[in-house]
Amino acid sequence: MAHVLPDLPYAYNALEPFISQQIMELHHKKHHQTYVNSLNAAEQAYAKASTPKERIALQSALKFNGGGHINHSLFWKNLAPAKSEGKGNGGALADGPLKSAIEQNWGSVDNFIKEFNATTAAIQGSGWGWLGLNPATKRLEITTTANQDPLLSHVPIIGVDIWEHAFYLQYLNVKADYLAAIWIVINFKEAERRLIEATK
């Protein structure tokens, strides 16, 4: 069954002024759509491949485009219109299991965000910053993946796209400004839902 581009759970301009409508339209309709199209093409080619060599040759396309589709599908749900703008619940972390786990690990939400942003900004080239649940220890950890690699070692709770297409048209080369702004539109309610689901 072919993969399809998921609808955004909000309008393209809903995350302004923190993420512009132009970025959201390009990111969703062009970049994510390309990952979906390329993943479908790679899977079709894999199904027709008749030799191990042909199947091996398709592995990188499957990983890259499959990861791009998985990561972005999670990313859109990870965002919400900003509460500070009176538009939604973005940026609002209420008392509950997620806030408690963050405070237990990092002392405060501010400390967590500082460490997350520093770790994510240090990625060389393109990639993703993650807050993930370590399935072995049941603890939250900050980690990164390169390019479009999906997070396989942890259960993803929050993912932040640090590819230039996610921020360059608005923030140019200043990753720090993008990383500061994105927390104002992070959907902590969705992140907490993932955490609760992962710890059942």
Swiss-Prot record:
Entry-linked Gene3D superfamilies: Fe,Mn superoxide dismutase (SOD) domain (1.10.287.990), Iron/manganese superoxide dismutase, C-terminal domain (3.55.40.20)
Principal subcellular localisation of the protein: mitochondrion
Cofactor note: Binds 1 Mn(2+) ion per subunit.
One GO term describing the cellular component: mitochondrial matrix
SUPFAM superfamilies, per database record: Fe,Mn superoxide dismutase (SOD), C-terminal domain (SSF54719), Fe,Mn superoxide dismutase (SOD), N-terminal domain (SSF46609)
UniProt keywords, alphabetically: Antioxidant, Manganese, Metal-binding, Mitochondrion, Oxidoreductase, Transit peptide
Entry cofactors: Mn(2+)
Residues holding Mn(2+): 27, 72, 161, 165
E.C. code: 1.15.1.1
GO molecular function, one term: manganese ion binding
Catalytically driven reaction(s): 2 superoxide + 2 H(+) = H2O2 + O2
Cell location: Mitochondrion matrix
Top-level lineage group: Eukaryota
Entry similarity comment: Belongs to the iron/manganese superoxide dismutase family.
Subunit structure, as described in the record: Homotetramer.
Protein task: Destroys superoxide anion radicals which are normally produced within the cells and which are toxic to biological systems.
Protein name per UniProt: Superoxide dismutase [Mn], mitochondrial
Organism per entry: Ganoderma microsporum
